Amino acid sequence: LDDDDHVDIELPFQVQYHGELYSEMTISSNGWVSLVPCNIDYFWNMSIPSFMGPKAMLAPFWDDLEVVGQDWIRVYTWHDTVGGRFIIEWSRALNGYDELTEETFEIIIYENSSMPTDSGDNVIDFQYLEIADVDVTKNYSTVGIQSPNNNDGNSIIFNNVYAAGAAPLSNGRAIRFTTMSPQSYVSPLEIETENTPDM
């Protein structure tokens, strides 16, 4: 993709997100996708939720990503039919802040046949191979997901402020969005059979 550009694609399988089905998406050169086709090409990232942002947005690293010394921002897609997943990867995109820092990250959307959920919504992962949130002049980055009506969202980070309990972005980090609750685990208590007071 070119600088501040987007492309519309057909999805290899229907994606259910917030209970709605989608068959296409818009991919932005600036580190986000929207399951609702949109023509937003500006680079300035905002908080989530945001009425001015894309609808049904998945933002693994919404920031000003640049084309410097290369012809395009390398964004790849791959439908892994064996693993039952669709991958969108931004590879070695240059951060617009310094035009030197390389960012490599991806979105993985799992088919329901490979990772089912009770709600039917697809499981979504953000994965980071090489990431550095350096853009001090333009709100750093925005990471999170936004609802189809832009009223709700799950924000991980905006303007270098993390959501409570969120792990910081780092190389090798993965973030999962799912409607499934985690398996509960409570470790067994150790019980002493004899209790004698110390004298």
Predicted regions and their residues:
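Extracytoplasmic Ser/Thr/Pro-rich, glycosylation-prone low-complexity segments
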Residues: 1-191
